[in-house]
């Protein structure tokens, strides 16, 4: 991942303004520690902090067309850049960077080229011939992008909020799958897949097609000129990613440079069952496995840094981001700059445990659509910013455009969880990779129950967070929470504690509004809370809040351990809510 900052149409064109923009761009240097660049044209500035993954020697940014009349600063990876270049034979490329193709596509097709890009990206392009500019973000929002407005009428774009929040009074999270054009002065959606309308598909389930499309998504993401690995938790999604990479690594170009032994990484509290599960998968696949550990106190000590980097006060995101943040630092110290991760599968296939209560296929499908549309506010944000904090790039094959189209075109009747038919959550994915002749994974891993990421770190992690928050947030503070924080009022002490840290770094109202809110159970949307009347009384992001679904649900454990406090203030769940919470070690894949 790189860091981009673009400021267009400023009133002040002094050297002091240029210095200020360079200073703000440095706030993104963690995203791109390999090189810095800036292009200034009259009242427009495009700055870049580079993480060199493809073409490390000549791909420094900003990038240009032949006569430098078109300038672009990009954060992303364009997996089909060679195919696109082949259709641009009249153009002369200056670098081997996958991102340079954007400048030349603009010359050929104007603003209508974005849907041709297969990859993850956020970019700003300036046409100096008429001083027009465009900005765009990838289909799902894998790469972060913010847009702001200065008091002088300038328009700002940044990979992270921290580079524009001080100088813009108003700013937003740039919507995924959209393009901004200065010519029209507005945003428009360039990504219009069939599933976006939420109409119910009727295509029969084709396991071979699903498997093949996922393998293609993996293979294209092996495009790298630097060492890479896979985040492996021992859960289904990360294990499938590791398995498919293992099968195809030897034939990939990267193997010639870095060898055909796959490196896998996991992190967790010592003694966690998922450390053993991840090692079992790694041994089965023959990977070079790196098992990393952290303590509850180390996680708590990192909270301020995590919230600063991830730029949210959402409880689930912070719980899950912290181990991923710690792991990314270790990964970078080992010389690895890119990892593949398993985000997105639960949204596409209804893998969260609350989907067991979906009343029919219509509501099941509509909820998956809502979840995918919100990914940029949750798992994409976590995966990108937790890794980018240490200059590591995370690639997410489940969010491949073509794979999503294939998966979301399946009649949702096949995705419904039906225990009487032997269909557990994500059965269509599990079944697609259930190969008796050449197994991808051991059966018990392939059919393992979903464990939510922050749950999987263990109750000793989550309870440690709650205990720490209880020491810093009093009952009287909670009584006044709605007055102190009228926007997205925190309803637990843990949420209140995170909010105080967030406000220290990002005190403006515009920053608060970039974070989602509303009721949720086990990571559901507010709409899905209506599926079970009991859920409205038990709104917690933990997967075990899906009462009557999880093997170690809260209701089962509460019979063994009394609630410790006011349920309004701390969710009412005591510290002994089941040692089985020490599962799904923080591989940062939420699987």
UniProtKB/Swiss-Prot annotation:
InterPro entries (UniProt xref): Asn_synth_AEB (IPR006426), Asn_synthase (IPR001962), Asn_Synthetase (IPR050795), AsnB_N (IPR033738), GATase_2_dom (IPR017932), Ntn_hydrolases_N (IPR029055), Rossmann-like_a/b/a_fold (IPR014729)
Annotated EC: 6.3.5.4
Active site: 2
Domain (Glutamine amidotransferase type-2) ranges: 2-185
Protein name: Asparagine synthetase [glutamine-hydrolyzing] 2
Pathway given in the UniProt record: Amino-acid biosynthesis; L-asparagine biosynthesis; L-asparagine from L-aspartate (L-Gln route): step 1/1
An example molecular function term from Gene Ontology annotations: asparagine synthase (glutamine-hydrolyzing) activity
Residues the record lists as binding ATP: 231, 267, 341-342
GO cellular component, one term: cytosol
The UniProt record lists the keyword Amino-acid biosynthesis: yes
Binding site for L-glutamine: 50-54, 75-77, 98
